Amino acid sequence: MDLNYKVTNIFPVPIHQFDVNGFDEIQNELIDYAYGLKKKEPKGVLISNYGGWQSSNFYIDNEDDVLHHFMINCLSGFPVIKVSVNMKVDAWVNINKPGDYNTKHHHPACDLSGVLWIKASKDCGKIEFQSPVEFQTYTEVESYTKDFKDSNNYYHTYYFTPTQGRMLVFPSHLQHQVRENKSNEDRISVSFNIRLSNEN
């Protein structure tokens, strides 16, 4: 019997990746900025961070501020967002020492969320996303061949390795966590939320 077979992937979940060219030219300034915030607010806030330091939220709206200016430039180059769409961005800085991690969470009351890695050494803790398909069973996923799973990104979880100067933007409803920092250095990142609105 001849069969014509095809797979149609519906309801994809886009993860947008930006790599900043020449990031090393501004990296030290951003690192100093992060530690400066921690010095001003040593206690930080506790949300999903286990052992790590997290700053209070702040809006990205000050062109004269080094981090704000950098983030505005990055997000203004978002190639798939319509020009007529306004983005309101709030952010916070994370400093995870060796042994620190972030538990599973999502970001409510916004449209997109993201992370920018400022300092990320080897084994500093991958970001892990969980499949949003709530009723997907382990048996179903593990019954498929490796080629099928790889070509369709069909997994329960998906990892990204932190890379300095890389930004990921993802749907805010997507559950995710940050694995333990197993390096000997601090892992520094900026997390942010984006609220979208149409001018027209």
Give the ranges of each region predicted by the language model:
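Non-heme Fe(II)/2-oxoglutarate
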Residues: 1-83, 94, 101
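Catalytic core of non-heme Fe(II) oxygenases with the double-stranded beta-helix
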Residues: 94-169, 186, 196, 200
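Short, compositionally biased
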Residues: 181-190
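Short histidine-centered beta-strand/loop micro-motifs
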Residues: 83, 102-107, 179-182
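Histidine-centered metal-chelating micro-motifs
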Residues: 100-101, 173-177
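Beta-strand secondary-structure signal
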Residues: 17, 113-115, 189-191
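Karyopherin-beta/Importin-beta family HEAT-repeat alpha-solenoid scaffold
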Residues: 3-8, 166, 177-178
